[in-house]
Each structure stands twice: as C-alpha cells, then as structure tokens.
C-alpha cells in the first residue's frame, strides 16, 4: 500500500475521461490518494490527453517540481509515454522505479513596459512575439550585448529543444534533441526585400546567452504567446528572452527513444 498523492488531469474528451477514471480506480486499489487538483504535497501528476492537455496541465500547476507522466489519448503525443491499454504496466514500473526522469528546460521572457513594470512568462514549448492581426512587426534584435538586426515579418518564435517539434517545426525550424539545452530562434514569415533584411532560418543559442527584443516605437501593440496562452501588451520598452532555470520533470519509461518517436510521428 502507498501513501503517495497523485493528481490526474484530463482534456475532457470521452476517452480521456474513461482512461482517467480507470487509472484512478487502479491507483486507489493500491492505496494511493488520487485527486483532480494540484497541491504542494502532490507526488505525481498524471496527464491524460495529447500534447495540448499536457501543456495546459503544466501551466495550471505553475511548472511543478514533482514528476509528471503523460497518458496518450490524443494525436501527436511527444510528451506521452503511456497508452490507455498499458495502465497496469505503468503503475508497476512506477512502483519499481523502472523509469527515467527527463529534465525539460523552459524558455522565459521578461517584458518591460515604458512605465517600468516587468512581466515574466514561461514556456515549455515556445514563446512567440507577434504584432497585431495581419500586420507585420518590426523588432530590433540583440544577442548578448551585440546588436544583430532589425527583424521584419509576422513574428519571432523562441523554442526550447522539447518544443522544437511543435510550432517551431511547422514554421521551418529545426528539430533539436531534447538533451541539448539550447534556445532556438525561428523567424515567422520574415521579410527579405531590398527594404527589409532578416534572417530567414533558425538561430541556435546556448542556454547562458540572452536575446533582447525592442519593438519599433510605432508598434503600439505586441502579442506575446507562451504555449498557447496569449497576452497583449501596449507600450513595450524591451523584452528579454533566455532559457529559464525552471524545468519540468517528465517520466520516461524504459525503452524510450526520442528519435524513434520523431520517426513514428513525422516519417
């Protein structure tokens, strides 16, 4: 019998609800305390659904320190290692310690407005900076203390290695092995004309290097999106983006291989 506390989240879909209930019954039969809310004493988070549900759970729990495991009832499922048909097998492996913890790095953006206020955002997959709908955005970019370019286009995407297979990949970014602690900067529909010159491919930065973004003075509205959570800003003075010290602890079962999953999902 166990005295551990486990929190189960699901995405509300019928299969996810059934799988969550089945998992709850199996865990309670083994003595676990199971609930549908996160508290500081939670020992494990089980997220049932797809990658979107996983990201929402991470943000809902404010990037928790406890391990989290994904049960895949969605489509892509890069964060999920457990199938609904293998719940008993997972519980046995969890109890016997037959798993690894994968540390997933996060990306952080600090937005400073002209009135001096600072706002911090974290992303497990990515953070994007865009302008108003259907408008190009013009951003001065510096890496470290070095000015690099004035970007013009739909926006910029800052991806972690774990997030490199998500939105980043769909806009032409590179797939990065999650064991690499890097920040990938990918342009979204960059302009490349005689009037505007921008990088048209991704840039990879080491984790200890920050990137600065300054919107042009005429840009009166910026949209920052972290993992699908959008925040509009007016009067932005600057934005600092870098790899965060916060990480997510994802359970990976024995036999997990990132590149095998890439092959299964994309090829």
PLM feature segments, named:
Residues 158-160:
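Conserved mixed alpha/beta catalytic, RNA-binding, or beta-rich assembly cores of soluble enzyme
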Residues 65-67:
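Proline-centered loop/turn at the N-terminus of a beta-strand
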Residues 69-71:
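Generic beta-sheet signal
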Residues 50-53, 74-76, 162-164:
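Short glycine-rich anion-binding loops that position phosphate/pyrophosphate groups of nucleotides
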Residues 40-46:
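Short acidic/histidine-rich motifs immediately flanking catalytic phosphotransfer sites
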Residues 2-39, 77-156, 165-267:
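Catalytic phosphate-donor-binding core of small-molecule kinases
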Residues 47-61:
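Short, structured active-site "lid" loops
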């Amino acid at each position: 019998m166990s005295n551990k506390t486990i929190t189960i989240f699901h995405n509300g879909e019928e299969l996810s609800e059934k799988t969550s209930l089945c998992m709850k019954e199996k865990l309670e039969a083994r003595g676990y305390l199971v609930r549908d809310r996160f508290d500081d004493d939670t020992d494990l988070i089980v997220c049932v659904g797809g990658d979107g549900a996983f990201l929402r759970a991470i943000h809902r729990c404010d990037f928790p320190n406890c391990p989290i495991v994904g049960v895949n009832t969605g489509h892509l499922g890069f964060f999920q290692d457990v199938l609904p048909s293998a719940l008993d097998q997972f519980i046995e492996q969890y109890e016997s310690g037959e798993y690894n913890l994968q540390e997933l790095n996060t990306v952080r953006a600090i937005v400073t407005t002209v009135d001096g206020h600072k706002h911090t955002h974290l992303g497990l997959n990515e953070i994007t900076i865009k302008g108003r709908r259907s408008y190009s955005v013009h951003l001065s970019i510096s890496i470290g203390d070095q000015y690099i370019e004035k970007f013009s286009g739909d926006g910029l995407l800052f991806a972690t290695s774990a997030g490199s297979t998500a939105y980043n990949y769909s806009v032409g970014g590179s797939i990065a092995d999650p064991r690499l602690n890097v920040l990938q900067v990918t342009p979204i529909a960059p302009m490349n004309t005689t009037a505007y010159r921008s990088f048209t491919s991704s840039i990879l930065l080491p984790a200890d290097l920050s990137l600065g973004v300054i919107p042009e003075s005429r840009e009166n509205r910026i949209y920052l999106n972290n993992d699908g959570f959008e925040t509009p800003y007016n009067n932005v003075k600057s934005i600092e983006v870098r790899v965060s010290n916060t990480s997510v602890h994802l359970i990976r079962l024995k036999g997990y291989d990132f590149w095998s999953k890439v092959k299964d999902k994309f090829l």
